Design a protein with these regions (language model features):
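Conserved acid/base catalytic micro-environments in cytosolic active-site loops
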Residues: 1-273
Length: 273
């Protein structure tokens, strides 16, 4: 089995079908990487729909991710509806735990797992979409030494997700879709020294994997807030901002695993009423 040197994790939401089609068309077949995609779809979406659409634009094999599958270089793996897509070193994991940012699959979950497993050899890409899923996952990649790429908001059909990332962190590249293939290929030709991801990134990835689900693990991440989780009714912890100054997003998590940005928490609470 040909293991990739890099992993490329991609998140898209509204407008994502066209953006992902153009993105995959830019990818170079010779790059030493595997690609993982989360696009927000309804729970009843047909799993093969996005895979078949993207396969029209690339010679790289596209497939719906399956639990326990070994990761192969040059393959594009797509999150199935209603399942979190996570990666460990060389292995795909599908998770059926709580939604994050009101989504399963969640972009943040995929990006955080890539940061925990591949650190400096994780490349995060945020494309068109509404609201802010993907921002904290991109911060996890940044904190772990990986590379952060966002679609130029002027190039995005829905610029919210790229703008949210740009508002909350410094990225390595803010570029148009047509420029991404060449930039990504250049990154995959490097050999960055691997490092260990921050403890908080690893803990949150383990929560999504359901490896740890308890008060002690969540309490290591922040302080108990006055808010209740709108999904399960349990307490919410406000996640501490990182001491390295990179983590600047206000967000919350319960011990079950539900996670919200501040914006998503407000939306979810308003839906309850």
């Amino acid at each position: 089995m040909n293991k990739p040197k890099f992993v490329i994790v991609v998140g898209a939401s509204a407008g994502g079908l066209n953006a992902l089609s153009e993105f995959t068309a830019q990818l170079k077949p010779r790059m030493n990487a595997a690609v993982f995609i989360v696009m927000h779809l309804s729970r009843t979406s047909i799993s093969d729909f996005l895979m078949l659409q993207l396969q029209k634009f690339t010679s790289l094999p596209c497939e719906v991710a399956t639990d326990g599958a070994e990761i192969e270089t040059g393959h594009i793996y797509i999150a199935p509806p209603n399942a979190h897509l996570l990666i460990k070193k060389g292995i795909i994991i599908l998770g059926y735990g709580p939604q994050e940012n009101r989504w399963r699959p969640s972009i943040d979950v995929l990006f955080r797992s890539a940061a925990a497993a591949y650190n400096t050899r994780a490349i995060g890409v945020i494309l068109t979409g509404l609201l802010d899923d993907g921002t904290t996952g991109m911060l996890a990649i940044k904190r772990s030494g990986g590379t952060c790429i966002v679609q130029d908001p002027n190039d995005a059909e829905y610029p919210d997700m790229p703008l949210s990332v740009l508002k909350n962190m410094e990225v390595d590249y803010c570029i148009s879709l047509v420029s991404m293939g060449e930039v990504i290929e250049g990154i995959t030709l490097t050999t960055p020294e691997e490092k260990t991801a921050p403890k908080e990134v690893i803990i949150e990835s383990q929560i999504a994997e359901r490896v740890v689900v308890d008060y002690d693990s969540v309490s290591q991440l922040g302080e108990k807030s006055i808010f209740a989780c709108p999904d399960c009714g349990g307490g919410l912890w406000k996640i501490n901002k990182s001491t390295d100054g990179i983590e600047r997003v206000d967000r919350y998590r319960c011990h079950i695993g539900h996670s919200y940005s501040e914006n998503d928490l407000v939306i979810k609470q308003s839906e309850k009423f």
